[in-house]
Amino acid sequence: MLYLIYQEDGDNATAIRAAKKEEHLAYLETHKDKLVLGGAALAEDGVARTGSILLLNVPSLADAEAFSQSEPFRMAGLFKLVKITRMRRGQWHPENAPKTAEGA
């Protein structure tokens, strides 16, 4: 089942992100069998980070919550809001995804 995890940054996010970045990336690599897509939520300027968005393929909401609660950024208190919602895959056109992280 697909679950979308939407996370909004809280206070001191820049410092927490810098301190926990390597742990965060290692955690995502360890769980890449569950991770469909992940990336930073950005302000309209395309530079300022406002949070993170993850799309997981896991058996249940409990599994999505466990993944989120064990993620190093969340454990460090980076996010002021975390919302997890189940979704159904509708249209799927991965060929339309940008070729770079910046969206080009």
Predicted segments, located by residue:
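Conserved, structured core segments of small domains
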Residues: M1-A104
